[in-house]
């Protein structure tokens, strides 16, 4: 898993004690703790304007496997970068970027798997708008 995920989990579970992380056999379960109301105040202050969009995304991906969620996030970021850079975009270019320019772990998924997930993203409306900063890909 991404280092960023571990950092986030550390903040919400160990530092702030908002959530307890229960590692299951094939999944991770997040248990809300009494201190969670403090997080809710933080969320409302910074993210309440995006609440409907966030809930929509959660509804779409909540039953995805970790691998599929990773693929969606990676494809979204790559696709968004193409939009920001105003480059010509195609499904093949996005998948090629992910498999060749991102972390080598992305190669564990076959090209057709990436293309299937990208197709599904379009069907459910997970389409980037070219907002934010370009993705910074760290050296391996």
Label every model-predicted segment:
Residues 1-140:
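Domain-edge interaction signal
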């Amino acid at each position: 898993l991404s280092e960023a995920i571990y950092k986030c989990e550390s903040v919400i579970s160990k530092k702030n004690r908002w959530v307890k992380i229960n590692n299951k056999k094939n999944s991770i379960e997040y248990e809300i703790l009494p201190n969670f109301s403090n997080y809710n105040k933080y969320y409302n202050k910074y993210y309440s304007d995006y609440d409907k969009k966030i809930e929509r995304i959660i509804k779409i991906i909540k039953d995805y496997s970790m691998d599929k969620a990773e693929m969606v996030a990676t494809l979204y970021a790559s696709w968004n970068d193409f939009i920001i850079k105003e480059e010509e975009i195609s499904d093949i270019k996005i998948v090629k970027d992910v498999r060749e320019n991102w972390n080598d772990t992305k190669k564990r998924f076959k090209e057709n798997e990436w293309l299937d997930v990208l197709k599904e993203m379009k069907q459910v409306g997970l389409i980037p708008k070219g907002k934010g900063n370009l993705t910074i890909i760290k050296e391996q």
